[in-house]
Swiss-Prot record:
EC number of this enzyme: 4.2.1.20
Physiological role: The alpha subunit is responsible for the aldol cleavage of indoleglycerol phosphate to indole and glyceraldehyde 3-phosphate.
Species, as recorded: Salmonella schwarzengrund (strain CVM19633)
EC top class, as a word: lyase
Catalytic reactions of this protein: (1S,2R)-1-C-(indol-3-yl)glycerol 3-phosphate + L-serine = D-glyceraldehyde 3-phosphate + L-tryptophan + H2O
Keywords: Amino-acid biosynthesis, Aromatic amino acid biosynthesis, Lyase, Tryptophan biosynthesis
Subunit structure, as described in the record: Tetramer of two alpha and two beta chains.
PROSITE patterns linked: TRP_SYNTHASE_ALPHA (PS00167)
Name assigned to this protein: Tryptophan synthase alpha chain
Family: Belongs to the TrpA family.
């Protein structure tokens, strides 16, 4: 969890927002996936949000569903994902690493065992996408026992009770949704969300990162101007992988260029 605190303190000193890319571990295969993650970091990613391949990702649109299918086609398992995470952590000791999970994957070997494994490989946070705040107690309690930040989603229509719960239970960062629905770069986030960000700050929530539909540098700078601590972009990045995975050098070059531009916008 301390890696998030250190990151946000450093960015604050530099008057920058965070740019956080999302990719699915093992897409389009383990070796390429590790190269992709190195490229994202080299190009300026401040933190990573990583998915573990799952057969029924309810919160995700077609782009990220396809990433899951490519990882499955490559035979990637959750155990291999944890091996990848250990390698990433060894190579990049300071970058915050977050997982975006579904409850079934957490339940598989027991909730406590899952968070213990996260701690062991150097994961900083876990967002369980299909567990609402009011059902989150066993997850967040296990997370905190293992020094893992439980991440909560704050939807655009959140009422005051939900805002207070998210602020109270969340650590690391708060995942602020640009809009309702599923992920996807084609559904552009309706920026900005001043009122929610102000309320979250008032209730001492973990810093807000805006996600869902973030696909252009202009959206990153708008999120930061609205008071968010940064932005998360998934589908736009996974699109680049989808279109170019047969030409790895081209894919890595396009990822580098996209992430560099998105990071530059966080300094605006």
């Amino acid at each position: 969890m301390e890696r998030y605190e250190n990151l946000f303190a450093q960015l604050n000193d530099r008057r920058e927002g965070a740019f956080v890319p999302f990719v699915t571990l093992g897409d389009p295969g383990i070796e390429q996936s590790l190269k992709i993650i190195d490229t994202l970091i080299d190009a300026g990613a401040d933190a990573l949000e990583l998915g573990v391949p799952f057969s029924d990702p309810l919160a995700d649109g077609p782009t990220i569903q396809n990433a899951n299918l490519r990882a499955f086609a490559a035979g990637v398992t959750p155990a291999q994902c944890f091996e990848m995470l250990a390698l990433i952590r060894e190579k990049h000791p300071t970058i915050p690493i977050g997982l975006l999970m579904y409850a079934n994957l957490v339940f598989n070997n027991g909730i406590d065992a899952f968070y213990a494994r996260c701690e062991q490989v150097g994961v900083d946070s876990v967002l369980v996408a299909d567990v609402p705040v009011e059902e989150s107690a066993p997850f967040r309690q296990a997370a905190l026992r293992h020094n893992i930040a439980p991440i909560f989603i704050c939807p655009p229509n959140a009422d005051d009770d939900l805002l207070r719960q998210v602020a109270s239970y969340g650590r690391g960062y708060t995942y602020l949704l640009s809009r309702s629905g599923v992920t996807g770069a084609e559904n552009r986030g309706a920026l900005p969300l001043h009122h929610l960000i102000e309320k979250l700050k008032e209730y001492h929530a973990a810093p807000a990162l805006q996600g869902f539909g973030i696909s252009s540098p202009e959206q990153v700078s708008a999120a930061v101007r609205a008071g968010a601590a940064g932005a998360i972009s998934g589908s736009a990045i996974v699109n680049i992988i989808e279109k170019n995975h047969a030409s790895p050098e081209q894919m890595l070059a396009e990822l580098r260029s996209f992430v560099s531009a998105m990071k530059a916008a966080s300094r605006a």
